[in-house]
Amino acid sequence: MAELISVRVKPGSRKGPLVEAGEDGALTLYVQERAVDGKANEAVTKLLAEHLGVPRSRIELVSGATSRHKRFRIG
């Protein structure tokens, strides 16, 4: 069963790679890669997979390819 997860992304961050959970449970992912040629999206997918303990192949970007607010399907 697939699950959808929404995250906020901070590309080009000096803090990254880091995952923070807010008080409301929302995840913010900090990555060092800049949002150029999909590099930040690749880094976010890798970081999310590590954080959730699932293979990268099970994570699919559903929406937000050019936005800081992204939705992923975990399958």
Swiss-Prot record:
<dbReference type="Pfam" id="PF02594">
    <property type="entry name" value="DUF167"/>
</dbReference>
<dbReference type="GO" id="GO:0005737">
    <property type="term" value="C:cytoplasm"/>
</dbReference>
<dbReference type="InterPro" id="IPR036591">
    <property type="entry name" value="YggU-like_sf"/>
</dbReference>
<comment type="similarity">
    <text>Belongs to the UPF0235 family.</text>
</comment>
<dbReference type="InterPro" id="IPR003746">
    <property type="entry name" value="DUF167"/>
</dbReference>
<protein>
    <recommendedName>
        <fullName>UPF0235 protein Mflv_3569</fullName>
    </recommendedName>
</protein>
